[in-house]
Amino acid sequence: MCIRDRSNFVEIIPEIDVPAHSLALTHYKPEIGSKEYGMDHLDLFKPETYEFVDALFKEYLEGDNPVFVGKRVHIGTDEYSNAKKDVVEKFRAFTDHYIRFVEGFGKQAVVWGALSHAKGDTPVKSENVVMNAWYNGYADPATMIKDGYQLISIPDGLVYIVPKAGYYYDYLNEPYLYKEWTPAHIGKAVFDEKHPSILGGMFAIWNDHVGNGISVKDIHHRIFS
């Protein structure tokens, strides 16, 4: 699919979302799930967690015919617990490790903004790293720009769709977005238009719920309406 869409000048950025939102991984390998923070969190204190995730990324990135053929790879890093300082530092080290890991395959790393939520002392690489700026409480955009990240503006309060969930949008408020919003507005933070550290904007559709009557066609209608 990446090759087909690239030929049509559409870039697919594949994502393996770790170390949270990782139930697909812990269902397969329960021993790397966190007993303290829930099985959707990987246990960052176990060496086998890194062995497994390293091997998973390698499976998609290495060889003469890799699955991920584009120039960018998303490593997730969304919504991990910040309950304790030691786990925050582990999360920051994990993030830095996988930024550098995918760069080792010639890819540009993309992450979800989380480093204000996970504020700590462990350095996380920022040079040539793209960050989805989705919620300013998780990643303050001014701080992230100062730290050297390139941002994609995707503020959840304006451009998140969760079909028939009762929170966020069911359909985007397109007239408002067209008339009032630009990617320079990230939550309540406003930057100069065409700021060199803001690459552009995106919207997201998240299928948080199954069995609520929403079909693939319904999802497409929300995207293309």
Predicted feature residues:
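Short glycine/threonine-rich loop-to-helix capping motif typified by GTGT followed
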Residues: 81-94, 121-136
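Acidic, contiguous N-terminal accessory segments
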Residues: 109-118, 125
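Carbohydrate-binding surfaces of carbohydrate-active enzymes
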Residues: 104-106, 115, 213, 225
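Hydrophobic faces of well-ordered beta-strands that scaffold small-molecule active sites
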Residues: 12-16, 73-75, 109-111, 129-133, ...
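Flexible, acidic glycine-rich loops studded with aromatic residues
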Residues: 122-129, 136-225
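Alpha-helical scaffolding within the catalytic cores
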Residues: 55-62, 117, 138-139, 186
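Active-site beta-loop-alpha junctions enriched in small/polar residues
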Residues: 15-21, 78-80, 114-117, 134-136, ...
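Substrate-binding cleft of carbohydrate-active enzyme catalytic domains
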Residues: 4-105, 109
